[in-house]
Regions:
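Long, well-ordered, tryptophan-enriched scaffold segments
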Residues: 1-27
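Short, small/polar residue-rich loop motifs at catalytic or cofactor-binding pockets
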Residues: 9, 120-123, 189-191
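Glycine-rich phosphate/pyrophosphate-binding beta-alpha loops
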Residues: 23-31, 124-127, 139-150, 208-215
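Alpha-helical support elements that line or immediately flank enzyme active sites
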Residues: 39, 208-233
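Internal maturation/activation junctions in enzymes
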Residues: 43-142, 151-155, 162-163, 170-171
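Extended C-terminal subregions enriched in glycine
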Residues: 132, 184-185, 218, 227-260
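Active-site rim segments in enzyme catalytic domains, especially the processed small/beta chain
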Residues: 134-204, 228, 232-233
Length: 260
């Protein structure tokens, strides 16, 4: 697989959130989880919901649960199966998912799985911009400390270990999970640099670290800027919500119960 690998140009995908186009990486990554969450949350008027209020936290967490249920079911290498991007990112589908959110009660069960541990981090994020508006949004992770622990001879770097994120169970019995291991296939992975453009022009280059926290963090940065009127420094410094307990795309079959 390594000898046959060739880099490729990946077209980012976007949704419009209250007049702002938010751009993320498509599967085999998880960038569209942030876009799905924004589509769901766009149906709520956050100009009337205080930042950090119980209602703000509740709506954010419920949107995350719904998006991550799809993350576990559909996000995988598109070269090995159809990923229904247009459907997942449609406003119509977001409206259907939004209708599942109760204003005063948490979703008690969303199938399936559990998230990865987030207490220890192995990711770095960097962004830079020049006076002409050229931006770089860069994220890198070996996955779990020293990655695979293997260094190609004479090259001076260690290979990452994202293959751990393949599904291994049930892959030889149908129907197989879309993220099942196969030769030449890319595993689901979590690293997602992002951009925001406005009226076709660059506005913000951003990203966060932390596995399943990344789409949650992206959504909160966008909401802080667009909904809560924060400047860039405030949006980055503001306290963040992190929800654990949603479905996971790497083979765990235990459903989320009791609202995560």
């Amino acid at each position: 697989d390594l000898a046959a690998h060739q880099g490729e140009w990946v077209e980012p995908v976007s949704v419009n959130y209250r007049g702002y186009d938010v751009w993320e990486l498509p599967p085999n990554s998880q960038g569209i989880a942030a876009l799905q969450m924004l589509n769901i949350l766009e149906g709520f008027d956050f100009s009337k919901i205080p930042f950090g209020s119980a209602e703000h936290v509740h709506l954010f967490v419920e949107a995350k649960k719904l998006a991550f249920a799809d993350r576990a079911r559909f996000y995988a290498d598109p070269d090995f199966g159809k990923v229904p991007l247009d459907w997942l990112l449609s406003k119509e589908y977001a409206a259907q998912r939004r209708a599942l959110i109760s204003p005063d009660r948490a979703l008690r069960e969303v199938q399936p799985g559990t998230p990865p541990e987030l207490e220890e981090g192995d990711t770095i994020y960097l962004t830079t911009a020049d006076a002409d508006g050229m931006m770089v949004s860069l994220i890198q992770s070996n996955y779990r400390g020293m990655g695979s622990g293997m260094a190609p001879h004479g090259l001076g770097f260690i290979l990452q270990d994202r293959g751990e994120m393949f599904v291994l169970e049930g892959c030889d019995t149908g129907p197989a999970h879309p993220n099942c291991y196969a030769s030449g296939k890319r595993p689901f992975q979590t690293i997602i640099p992002a951009f925001i453009t406005r009226d076709g022009k660059p506005w913000v280059s951003f990203g966060v670290m932390g596995g399943a926290m990344q789409p949650q963090g992206h959504v909160q940065i966008v909401m802080n800027l667009v909904d809560f009127g924060m400047n860039l420094q405030e949006a980055g410094d503001a306290p963040r919500i992190q929800h654990e307990g949603s479905t996971d795309p790497t083979g765990a079959a235990t459903p989320m119960r009791d609202g995560g």
